[in-house]
UniProtKB/Swiss-Prot annotation:
Family, as annotated: Belongs to the tetrahydrofolate dehydrogenase/cyclohydrolase family.
PROSITE patterns attached to this UniProt entry: THF_DHG_CYH_2
Record keywords: Amino-acid biosynthesis, Histidine biosynthesis, Hydrolase, Methionine biosynthesis, Multifunctional enzyme, NADP, One-carbon metabolism, Oxidoreductase, Purine biosynthesis
Binding site for NADP(+): G177, K178, S179, I202, I243
Entry's Gene Ontology BP terms: L-histidine biosynthetic process; methionine biosynthetic process; purine nucleotide biosynthetic process; tetrahydrofolate interconversion
Name of the featured protein: Bifunctional protein FolD 2
Pathway connected to this protein: One-carbon metabolism; tetrahydrofolate interconversion
EC number: 1.5.1.5, 3.5.4.9
Subunit structure: Homodimer.
Length: 297
């Protein structure tokens, strides 16, 4: 039977890390950087967004990214291609965008249709324009701590941690999730800050006991309410990357994270879902686009 955390002070309330407010602050800095680039180059940075097919979730994400670009003054160039687009045709478009000097960032919305190799397409993007940070060159730079463009969600996670932790040196950090997009990059970023990092996943044996030792918990397993209250020691900082849509009352759906938010109020701080990591991901995409423009000089 799972232990209870009822021994914790029931009146305790964890600090809610406000991802929306931190994202707004980042957007203000990004907008100022865009104005500086316009003053220098005579034109704002350009972001090309490529969507293949009409997956409803992808269309929503793309719409949010286009609107976010408008807010900070980045020019967005939308390329909507039919679902039957061939891989060669997509690679031809990417080659054209790579060569276009008005484009500083290229984002291909994934997942792509099953007949297209995601890895081959993402590897075709110029690493200097790879604002998602997925190109093998940028992955290598991240793993060796030599700069490059960092994946947006992990970058946002670190900014959320920075809002409540001054120095991560020597802290025990547990990452739950081993994806190339989130889990592994976050582990590398935490190592760069000299945290002691353990990477786990839902098949890890004794997972609750491992998590219970952590000062920092990053939950990115895609498993709703996986992290229970008894997994979390008092004073831990929790970043919940998970987002799952579950049936709610009256036929509506509700969004939940990988953390049982109501059970972890004895933590020092925790991100809500929604309103935590999500806003940071798009804000970091914009910041990466500006960084790509600045790196070009």
């Amino acid at each position: 039977m799972a232990p209870s955390h009822a021994a914790h002070d029931s009146a305790a309330t964890a600090h809610r890390i406000d991802g929306r407010a931190i994202a707004r602050s980042l957007d203000e800095r990004t907008a100022a950087a865009v104005r500086a680039i316009v003053a220098r180059d005579g034109a704002p940075p350009g972001l090309a967004v490529v969507l293949v097919g009409n997956d409803p979730a992808s269309e929503v994400y793309v719409g949010r990214k286009i609107e976010a670009c408008r807010r900070v003054g980045i020019l967005s160039f939308e390329h909507r291609l039919p679902a039957q687009t061939t891989q060669d045709a997509l690679l031809t478009l990417i080659a054209r965008l790579n060569a276009d000097p008005t484009i500083h960032g290229i984002l291909v919305q994934v997942p792509l249709p099953s007949h297209i190799d995601d890895g081959m397409v993402l590897s075709a993007i110029d690493p200097a324009k790879d604002v998602d940070g997925f190109h093998p060159v940028n992955v290598g730079r991240l793993s060796t701590g030599t700069g490059g463009l960092v994946p947006c969600t992990p970058l946002g996670v670190m900014m959320l941690l920075d809002s409540v932790i001054d120095d991560m040196k020597g802290m025990d950090a547990v990452v739950i999730g081993k994806s190339n997009i989130v889990g592994k990059p976050i582990a590398m970023l935490l190592l760069e800050r000299e945290a002691t990092v353990t990477v786990t996943h839902i098949e890890t044996r004794g997972l609750p006991d491992i998590v219970r030792k952590a000062d920092i918990i990053v939950a990115a397993a895609g498993a709703p309410r996986l992290v229970k209250g008894y997994w979390v020691k008092e004073g831990a900082v929790i970043i919940d990357v998970g987002i799952t849509r579950l049936p709610g009352e009256g036929g509506k759906t509700r969004l939940v994270g990988d953390v049982a938010f109501d059970e972890v109020q004895h933590a020092r701080a925790v991100t809500p879902v929604p309103g935590g990591v999500g806003p940071m991901t798009i804000a970091c995409l914009l910041a990466n686009t500006v960084k790509a423009a600045e790196m070009r000089g």
